[in-house]
A protein has these predicted regions:
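Active-site-proximal loop/turn and secondary-structure-junction residues that shape catalytic pockets
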Residues: 87, 128-130, 186-190, 225-229, ...
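Active-site loop ensemble at the mouth of alpha/beta enzyme cores that anchors a bound cofactor
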Residues: 342-349
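Non-catalytic accessory regions flanking glycosidase/transglycosidase catalytic cores in CAZymes
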Residues: 8-20, 25-181, 199-228, 288-293, ...
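Short, flexible/disordered intra-domain loops and linkers
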Residues: 97-98, 194, 261-269, 336-341, ...
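Secretory targeting signals
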Residues: 1-2
Length: 505
């Protein structure tokens, strides 16, 4: 099993490798789901729509990326977007040399203006290090070569952060910026992203947190934004000792992360349960400190499997305030410049393929968005809700998706092991014979791949072909079905498939 460190070290090679999908499944296995329309068990917090990830800040200036963001907002209810590198030298924030004594926030404004104009707020990742403040010249091995060294002076870093925050308040107003989140750095426990030590990061966090609160006590700051849920006890202990604010705790988990590192035991959980188990562990670590009850943000995770997305979100509901899937768009150039719009096997990180083409992961979020705000009791693979019109429930057929890295975007092959299932959904409290609407997403329905293959799998589809592919990948109109006399609906779901059942009262 690869882990995040190995992924980063072998990223370019993994991207260059050929990819394919192989699916193995048997026919006809049954799954039982029961939903009680009469039993409201509390609020259903839409933790999945609070944030999603993206590439670097400068990529957000592109029309194609902004079109993807706008679509995400309009069709999935996305509230915030997180991206790297708001301080990167490619935005000219503070390169040093002949560029003046003060920071330049012109391009920062263009980035945030573009996000806010589309009805989305930024989740502000404070990264990476402006050249003027850097203690060295170590660069991130991405296409944009950001400086990943600690600040030469934590005090100067703090003054810079204070000036940055004051500028944001001057431009957007305190009431707006108080709704944002300020996350200090990205994965500082990986040498790929930070050349300093844990102590260097803690000093950097202290300076940033004190600077932000020095401008406005109502602004929200948190961290440590580590990979694989590392440094939690140490970070929270340091902050408690130094009496520092931690308004939220953030970390990243991928299903393929090293379980020995995560849990102290290799292969303790199947892929599907790694993320929920890690979130339960982090929640327990937080609540053992003075920061008990602090919001837990899973500010990076990912899956390209519809059923896996539904399963992970459903099982993280008790622990997380927000889950930010990486990432919204295949306008994405961290390791290299993609030479494809679609491809077999691993299709990249983006839930929207290039040219605004929806993928099954995006369409899964569209279905999640149609769930209501009250949760209904359910057993089996289901997330059920009460809506203004009646009820909506997402059901799924979970399969094991095996990729070397455990995440989309870095895998040379994609192997799916699962069974096609007849999912029998009993709706307790529904009128026998009632009409329901059913919408499906899997690797064939709500997917661009069937039409792309039909067109000959072109590497560079023509404009007319792109339009055909995009139309083919849209969610189909709901299928109208009737419950049987026992209030049961039987669905035929392939491995990875999800279905949204909607019932009018």
């Amino acid at each position: 099993m690869w882990n995040r460190r190995e992924i980063m070290g072998a990223g370019a090679a993994a991207f260059a490798a050929s990819s394919f999908t192989r699916t193995a499944f048997a026919q006809g296995e049954q799954e039982q789901v029961e939903i009680d329309l009469r039993q409201d068990i509390g609020a259903l917090d839409h933790i999945w729509s609070r944030c999603a990830g993206s590439d670097r800040a400068s990529a957000t200036l592109r029309e194609a990326w902004r079109n993807d963001l706008e679509r995400f907002r309009n069709e999935t209810g996305l509230e915030r977007v997180r991206f790297h590198g708001i301080f990167n030298d490619d935005l000219g924030v503070w390169p040093g040399g002949m560029n003046g004594k003060d920071p330049n926030f012109q391009n920062v404004d263009a980035v945030y203006d573009g996000v806010l104009e589309r009805g989305v707020q930024p989740f502000v990742e404070l990264s990476f290090m402006p050249k003027k403040l850097a203690s060295g010249n170590t660069k991130l091995s991405f296409t944009y070569n950001a400086n990943i060294t600690p600040p030469a002076s934590p005090e100067a870093w703090g003054q810079f952060i204070a000036g940055f925050v004051r500028h944001l308040i001057d431009r957007y107003g305190a009431n707006e910026v108080r709704q944002w989140y300020f996350e200090v750095w990205n994965e500082p426990n990986l040498t790929w992203f930070f050349s300093g030590t844990q102590a260097d990061y803690f000093a950097m966090y202290k300076a940033a947190a004190q600077a932000i609160k020095g401008v406005d006590q109502k602004l929200r700051v948190g961290g440590p934004s580590t990979a694989a849920a590392q440094w939690m006890p140490e970070f929270l202990g340091f902050c408690a000792q130094e009496n520092l604010p931690v308004d939220f705790v953030s970390t990243h988990i991928y299903a393929g992360d090293d379980q020995m590192e995560l849990f102290g035991q290799a292969n303790r959980y199947p892929h599907k349960d790694v993320i929920p188990a890690a979130m339960a562990q982090v929640r327990k670590q937080i609540d053992a400190t003075r920061y008990r009850g602090a919001e837990l943000w899973l500010s990076e995770w990912s899956s390209d499997s519809p059923a896996m997305i539904a399963h992970v979100i459903s099982n993280c509901l008790p622990y997380c305030h927000a889950m930010s899937q990486w990432c919204i768009s295949n306008v994405f150039e961290e390791i290299n410049f993609p030479n494809f719009i679609l491809k077999e096997g691993d299709g990249g990180w983006g839930m929207l393929a290039q040219r605004n083409i929806p993928r099954p992961s995006f369409n899964t979020y569209k279905l999640l968005h149609r769930l209501g705000q009250r949760r209904l009791a359910a057993t089996g693979p289901a997330l059920a809700s009460r809506t203004k019109e009646g009820a909506a429930a997402l059901v799924w057929n979970l399969a094991e998706v095996k990729q070397p890295s455990g995440v989309p975007g870095m895998a040379s092959q994609r192997i799916v092991n699962g069974q096609r299932k007849n999912v029998q959904v009993r709706l307790k409290g529904a009128r026998p014979g009632a009409t329901v609407r059913v919408s499906y997403v899997d690797q064939e329905r709500g997917s661009p791949l069937p039409k792309w293959r039909e067109l000959g799998s072109p590497q560079y589809p023509r404009k007319g072909e792109i339009d055909q592919i995009r139309r083919s990948a849209e969610l189909a109109s709901p299928e109208t079905r009737r419950l049987d006399r026992q209030g049961v609906l039987t669905l035929d779901l392939p491995p990875e498939g999800v279905a949204l059942i909607e019932l009018k009262a």
